[in-house]
């Protein structure tokens, strides 16, 4: 059973191994990163103690890897949602709620001398969208995962976000980059085996036979990242690829 001592042990392990830090120099940001990595472990392969109706506790496996394996074996019809914007919200709090582990993580984090609410605010919102379109796209993924539907969401991973709005001293509105990846994103899973050449600019040239060949321009290498979307107390995991 995943208990509070197991959670604190997992967090401490990430502090020492993933972050290469020790208790004497650990601040709220470091504690958040370690706790978030611990929560990601639970979304990947571990077990969570759940209480669906606050009456009957049951023990269910919430396993990202098993979700993908089950889809591969059963070959169901899949849906792929491509959207230029996603307003995902903060992943850490959402993950703890949907795993049914928020109270245990709160207690475990307090035993380490930190406060869960202080850590939650350290997560930067994924600057991948705003407004109704972005939130609707995020709701599609949350709902699909909760209903155990094989849905994948795809978008662009904006390094500096779409933009952030600032107010100048004279009261005018300013637009500036949003460096939301300044401290990286502990919930991302880089897929170094999935890379694509993306070409900007250039021109299309006709060859013999009428074929068009793109030439010139600037070429960049795009790397894929996955982010797990936990369903509301469900074993299913949708995937968000950027």
Predicted regions and their residues:
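A conserved ligand/cofactor-binding region detector
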Residues: 1-242
């Amino acid at each position: 059973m995943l208990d509070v001592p197991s959670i604190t042990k997992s967090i401490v392990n990430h502090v020492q191994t993933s972050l290469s830090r020790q208790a004497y120099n650990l601040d709220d940001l470091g504690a958040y990163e370690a706790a978030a990595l611990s929560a990601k472990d639970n979304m990947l392969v571990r077990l969570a103690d759940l209480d669906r109706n606050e009456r009957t506790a049951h023990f269910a496996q919430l396993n990202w890897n098993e979700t993908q394996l089950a889809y591969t074996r059963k070959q169901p019809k899949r849906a792929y949602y491509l959207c230029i914007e996603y307003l995902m919200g903060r992943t850490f709090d959402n993950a703890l709620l949907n795993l049914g582990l928020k109270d245990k993580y709160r207690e475990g984090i307090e035993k380490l001398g930190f406060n869960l609410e202080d850590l939650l605010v350290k997560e930067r919102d994924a600057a991948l969208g705003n407004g109704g379109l972005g939130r609707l796209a995020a709701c599609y993924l949350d709902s699909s995962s909760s209903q155990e539907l094989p849905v994948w969401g795809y978008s662009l991973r904006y390094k500096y976000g779409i933009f952030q709005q600032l107010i100048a001293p004279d009261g005018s509105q300013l637009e500036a980059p949003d460096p939301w990846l300044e401290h990286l994103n502990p919930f991302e899973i880089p897929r170094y085996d999935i890379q694509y050449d993306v070409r900007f600019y250039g021109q299309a040239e006709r060859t013999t036979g009428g074929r068009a060949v793109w030439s010139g321009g600037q070429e960049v290498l795009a790397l894929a990242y996955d982010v797990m979307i936990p369903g509301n107390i469900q074993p299913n995991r949708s995937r968000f690829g950027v």
